[in-house]
Amino acid sequence: MSASETDRWAWLLVLSFVFGCNLLRILLPSLSSFISRVLQKDAEQESQMRAEIQGMKQELSTVNMMDEFARYARLERKINKMTDKLKTHVKARTAQLAKIKWFISVAFYILQAALMISLIWKYYSVPVAVVPSKWITPLDRLVAFPTRVAGGIGITCWILVCNKVVAIVLHPFS
């Protein structure tokens, strides 16, 4: 394909990139949760600790507090210690999970910004699409920015329009 043919399909390229980025933005929470679950295998240890605590609580319910106070108190301290250990473990895992999700979100937005900047750079002086100038008469200079082509739609305006249209189309799925 020649450069002029590539420029002719620029509107579709930009629209597809904007659609893909918005779709990924909607799927980002699910994607980051999946990735963090894959990276963290501590949930098994937590469930094992919960099972141990549950077992000790059942054992505690069978012990008579009046007759076997020392055993009852020892078991209760053990349950409290294990519960505190579990809480600490869960807090650490939750903090790590938040860091992973934050990193994935930041990486996505940096990639999206780089993609949009590269599209603006490539199509800065070329109109993404050309329509009859009377269709956009009152706003033709604003819509054509930065190309200055009569009836042309500039990349910045096209990206804004695509973002709005795609956001409206994908709103029911978010």
Curated annotation (Swiss-Prot):
Location(s) in or outside the cell: Endoplasmic reticulum membrane
Membrane-protein topology: Multi-pass membrane protein
One BP term from GO: otic vesicle development
Keyword Nucleus included in the entry's annotation: no
UniProt xrefs under InterPro entries: Get1, Helix_hairpin_bin_sf
Cytoplasmic side: 30-99, 170-174
TM region(s), chain numbering: 9-29, 100-120, 149-169
Keyword field contains Membrane: yes
Top-level taxon of the source organism: Eukaryota
Gene3D superfamilies: Helix hairpin bin
Main location (coarse class): endoplasmic reticulum
Any coiled-coil regions, as ranges: 39-94
Keywords tagged on the record: Coiled coil, Endoplasmic reticulum, Membrane, Transmembrane, Transmembrane helix
Pfam families the record matches: CHD5
Lumenal side: 1-8, 121-148
GO annotations of cellular component type: endoplasmic reticulum; endoplasmic reticulum membrane; GET complex
Oligomer status and interactors: Component of the Golgi to ER traffic (GET) complex, which is composed of GET1, CAMLG/GET2 and GET3. Within the complex, GET1 and CAMLG form a heterotetramer which is stabilized by phosphatidylinositol binding and which binds to the GET3 homodimer. Interacts with CAMLG/GET2 (via C-terminus). GET3 shows a higher affinity for CAMLG than for GET1.
Purpose: Required for the post-translational delivery of tail-anchored (TA) proteins to the endoplasmic reticulum. Together with CAMLG/GET2, acts as a membrane receptor for soluble GET3/TRC40, which recognizes and selectively binds the transmembrane domain of TA proteins in the cytosol. Required to ensure correct topology and ER insertion of CAMLG.
Sequence similarity: Belongs to the WRB/GET1 family.
The protein's name: Guided entry of tail-anchored proteins factor 1
Encoding gene per record: Get1
